[in-house]
Amino acid sequence: MKQAYLDLDLIQLSTENAAVHLNKEFVLIDNLDEVPEQTNMEMEFVNHPVKLSFTIAIFCLTGRMSVQINLQEFELRANDILIVLEGSIGEYRGMSDDTRIAVIAFSSEYFQTALQVDATMSLQHKLYSSPFYHLSPAAMEETMAIYRLMKAKIAETDNPFRKGVLLGYTQVLTYNSYKYLLAADADDGKLNGKSGRQQELYTRFIREVQKSYTKERSISYYANVLCVTPKYLSQVV
C-alpha cells in the first residue's frame, strides 16, 4: 500500500542541488541568481505530500508559487512569506518561470530564541494556525539581507562559530516575525481578552511550558497534560 505522504528530513533536503547547509541541520535553498529558464527547481517530492521533521520558511520575491499546507491551499507572490512548523504535512505544487524564492529550513534547536517562553510559544501557535503573511518591500529587503549573511557564514568552513552566528541571525528573524504578526493582529482587531477560565488555563500552560519546553514543543503534548483538546488549547493560547 502506498504511503499517504513522504517523511522529509533535513538530511534529505540538504542533498537538493541548490542547497547549502551546516551539518545538515540548517539548510538554505534559493534560485536568486538563476536566469529564468533555470528557475524550475526539480525536487523529488513535487506534487506529493511530505511530513516535515523541521521548520521551514519560504520567502517569495517575485512570481507565483503554489503549495498546500495541512490541506490548506496557498499561493505565494512577491513579498509573501510562508512559515511551516515541524510536523506539518505539505505539498509543493509548482511555481511560475519568473519565481524567485529563498528557503530556510532548520531543526527545532534553532527555533529557541531570546524571546520570553510565553512569547515564543505564542509565535509558534500563530504560525501553526496562520503560516502565511505579507511583508512590506522594506521588511523583505531586510530579511533577504539577513538570508545572504547566513549563506555567506555557512561558506566560512574554517569558522568554528558558524552555528552560534546562525542561531543569532535566526533570533533576529524570529523577533521580526513576532513583530509582524503582532502588528497584523492589531490591524485586524484580533487581540481579545481571555475569560477567567481561559486565563487560568493559559497560566497553567505557560507553567508547563517553562518546565518542559526544552523537551516538548507541540500543542498536542501540552493539551494532553492539561486534559483539554489540542483545538481548544490552540484557541486559548
Describe each region flagged by the PLM.
Residues 79, 233-234:
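Short hydrophobic/aromatic patch on the recognition helix
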Residues 157-164, 178-207, 211-221, 225-226:
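Short, Lys/Arg-enriched, Trp-marked, Pro/Gly-tolerant hinge/linker segments that flank
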Residues 3-4, 93-154:
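A hydrophobic/aromatic-rich effector-binding and dimerization subdomain
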Residues 82, 86-92, 111:
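Histidine-centered metal-chelating micro-motifs
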Residues 71-86:
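Short acidic-glycine-tyrosine-enriched beta hairpin
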Residues 1-65, 72-74:
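Generic protein-terminus/edge-of-domain signal
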